[in-house]
Amino acid sequence: MTVMKFDLIKKEGKARRGKISFPRGDIQTPAFMPVGTYGAVKSLSPVELKEMGAEIILGNTFHLWLRPGTEIIKKHGSLHGFNGWDKPILTDSGGFQVFSLGKMRKLTEEGVTFKSPINGSKVFLSPEISMQVQRDLGSDIVMCFDECTPYPATEKEAKESMELSMRWAKRSKDAHGDNPSALFGIIQGGMYEHLRDESLAKLKEIDFDGFAIGGLSVGEPKEDMIRILDHTAHQMPEDKPRYLMGVGTPKDLVEAVYRGVDMFDCVMPSRNARNGHIFTSEGVIKIRNSKYKDDTSPLDPNCDCYTCKNFTKSYLHHLDKTKEILGSRLNTIHNLTFYQNLMKSIRKALDEGRFAEFRKEFLANYK
């Protein structure tokens, strides 16, 4: 029996306002989860993440398993004890990382054999191992082990990949056993609606605590992503959280909420921050651009983050040019605050029954 509880508070069209509850804390939805690949969101402390409104973060099973390994993490009790984050943590299963290794992997019915990107040694990962690693990490939300269908894929390739993922989903559920953490199933099927339907039907039959849409934002055109979302999101169980994996831009989040999604994660705000790409209420600023050299205005006049309250575009441009670590930190603080504030605004609009209006306004102003 899972310790997770999901309350659907309100709906506007397909958009949903809810709350996911765990012993470690509540998550107001729609929610964005900052990504802490190695247990840490790059350059930020848990205190800073909490200050910007994050209620859950994502950790990476694959990378944490390879380094430092679960024995070291278990000495701290859990990943929470290791990284000092005392709120909920979702861990992905490692399936996407294995997918991204490309030709360095060998896929069989049993699992995946690959060369460790750390020392080149041979490593094997299966649904059973992924479930054990996530149990050792003490994750609040565990993701079932799947194969992320590549893009482009023929219908035959997408079908075979999806069917393998469904067999692995069943093995993940069996191996999860008496673990009280929530277990989410992942819908695959590439860009083919009928395969997505088959996948969802199978996952409902196996029965999971939440459902995720995988295999999007892997290089497909935006209209394909929206087409699959339009088709799939509203068919997912109404009484369980819906999670869109690895997505995306601010516009993507607004459009996915409109279609009924509750949870998101993406490296974009933190990765882009380190490359000088800043999200603002009017669109993206590239702080490296020489036009900001003597610009004494803040990044975003509508933002209340530490960066916007204390520093100018000119100073952030200077930090970027001189490759100061502080530049990455200040940019990351701003970008992740922007994402959390966007989710707060979405939740407020849903609370007040004006999300349709909010979406229209946001899409018109955000370039």
Swiss-Prot record:
Transmembrane segments: none annotated. Keywords: Glycosyltransferase, Metal-binding, Queuosine biosynthesis, Transferase, tRNA processing, Zinc. The active site is at 92 (proton acceptor), 265 (nucleophile). GO terms for biological process: queuosine biosynthetic process; tRNA wobble guanine modification; tRNA-guanine transglycosylation. It holds the Pfam family TGT. One of its GO terms (molecular function) is tRNA-guanosine(34) queuine transglycosylase activity. Substrate binds at residues 92-96, 146, 188, 215. Pathway: tRNA modification; tRNA-queuosine biosynthesis. GO terms for cellular component: cytosol. Its EC number is 2.4.2.29. It is an enzyme of class 2 (transferase). Zn(2+) binds at residues 303, 305, 308, 334. Binds 1 zinc ion per subunit. It catalyses: 7-aminomethyl-7-carbaguanine + guanosine(34) in tRNA = 7-aminomethyl-7-carbaguanosine(34) in tRNA + guanine. Its cofactor is Zn(2+). Residues 246-252 are annotated as: RNA binding. Catalyzes the base-exchange of a guanine (G) residue with the queuine precursor 7-aminomethyl-7-deazaguanine (PreQ1) at position 34 (anticodon wobble position) in tRNAs with GU(N) anticodons (tRNA-Asp, -Asn, -His and -Tyr). Catalysis occurs through a double-displacement mechanism. The nucleophile active site attacks the C1' of nucleotide 34 to detach the guanine base from the RNA, forming a covalent enzyme-RNA intermediate. The proton acceptor active site deprotonates the incoming PreQ1, allowing a nucleophilic attack on the C1' of the ribose to form the product. Homodimer. Within each dimer, one monomer is responsible for RNA recognition and catalysis, while the other monomer binds to the replacement base PreQ1. PANTHER family: QUEUINE TRNA-RIBOSYLTRANSFERASE. Belongs to the queuine tRNA-ribosyltransferase family. This is Queuine tRNA-ribosyltransferase. It comes from Francisella tularensis subsp. novicida (strain U112). The gene is tgt.
